Amino acid sequence: MADMKSIQADTREKMNKAIEAFENNLSVLRTGRANPGILKKIVVDYYGSQMPIDQVASITTPDPRTLVITPWDRGALNPIEKAIRDSDLGLNPNNKGDTIFISLPMLTEERRKDLVKNAKNYAEDARIAVRNLRKHALDEVKKVEGLGEDEIKRGEADVQKITDEYVARVESVFQKKEQEILG
């Protein structure tokens, strides 16, 4: 049987993973600035293997509106270009022979609102994940043998404090991303 400290530590660890997954989801949302993270989920058909783009090329940002993709093997140039075109990012890669340039257009107000809406959905998913972890932790607290009613209440209050802390972190990360998008 677990004790209170291990339940709290386990809950924090799982909630940290939920926050990391949330931040990872947000990193692929396009803001007003060029960010290599927006290409993170692009998979390239590289000699018959499906490879993440960052494993076949380097991605740099020479200025706030441009991404430059330099494949380590020139044979990957066309598959990278195709993968970017086929993605749902709406990007238009420009193949220069040994590198690919992507000029990011200014975001329209409508597109910014859509991005904020997506970020809000990711935030809600993260809050739900944190609340589910709270429920699991509360169930674990009730299973601990040899605890009196006061100790159980204290354990539940501690779990709630941890939950409140992580929900606040979700909100903080969301607000920061919202400012980036609208900024």
Curated annotation (Swiss-Prot):
InterPro entries, A to Z: Ribosome_recyc_fac, Ribosome_recyc_fac_dom, RRF_sf
Location in the cell: Cytoplasm
Example GO BP: translation
Record field: transmembrane: none
Keyword Hydrolase applies: no
UniProt GO cellular component terms: cytoplasm
Major localisation: cytoplasm
Keywords: Cytoplasm, Protein biosynthesis
Record has Cytoplasm as a keyword: yes
GO molecular function: ribosomal large subunit binding
Record SUPFAM superfamilies: Ribosome recycling factor, RRF
Pfam family, one: RRF
CDD domains: RRF
Family the UniProt entry places it in: Belongs to the RRF family.
HAMAP family in alphabetical order: RRF
Function per UniProt: Responsible for the release of ribosomes from messenger RNA at the termination of protein biosynthesis. May increase the efficiency of translation by recycling ribosomes from one round of translation to another.
PANTHER family to which the protein is assigned, alphabetical: MITOCHONDRIAL RIBOSOME RECYCLING FACTOR PSEUDO 1 (PTHR20982:SF3), RIBOSOME RECYCLING FACTOR (PTHR20982)
Name by which UniProt lists this protein: Ribosome-recycling factor
Organism encoding this protein: Deinococcus radiodurans (strain ATCC 13939 / DSM 20539 / JCM 16871 / CCUG 27074 / LMG 4051 / NBRC 15346 / NCIMB 9279 / VKM B-1422 / R1)
Upper classification of the organism: Bacteria, Thermotogati, Deinococcota, Deinococci, Deinococcales
